[in-house]
């Protein structure tokens, strides 16, 4: 969901509606809204991550501009599976140091979309795709080849939709 209601403004609007005594149908007050209110709420520019097929496709105005194999998180290790859902890109950082309980990784391109889970290059990997994630999976992030991470980073903007599914 890319809509987020403005609770303070919504409370004010509801109080005013109740005090007016007039029955009404109204749209909630939003802090921000999705790219459209039609049948396609994400628009035509977004990142699609297919965990089953270990693939990332970045669509720009409906055209795939990046299509790459990935290594996602290992779903068999608690806390390491890549979360599914619809997100908005939180930030872009280059370079970045990613830290966890038992690791520290230097990456050139960091694009988080779900807290500490994001898309990034993985210079320590020479292969991507297939079933690698089942025995060499990440801690939840989406690892992509360096050149593909650079291309995604150059074209993605904070707030763009990221759709992750199995």
Name each region found by the language model:
Residues 1-78, 86-87, 91-104, 109, ...:
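Surface-exposed, secretory/extracytoplasmic low-complexity segments enriched in Ser/Thr/Asn/Gly/Pro
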Residues 81-84, 96-166:
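Exported/periplasmic cell-wall-interacting domains
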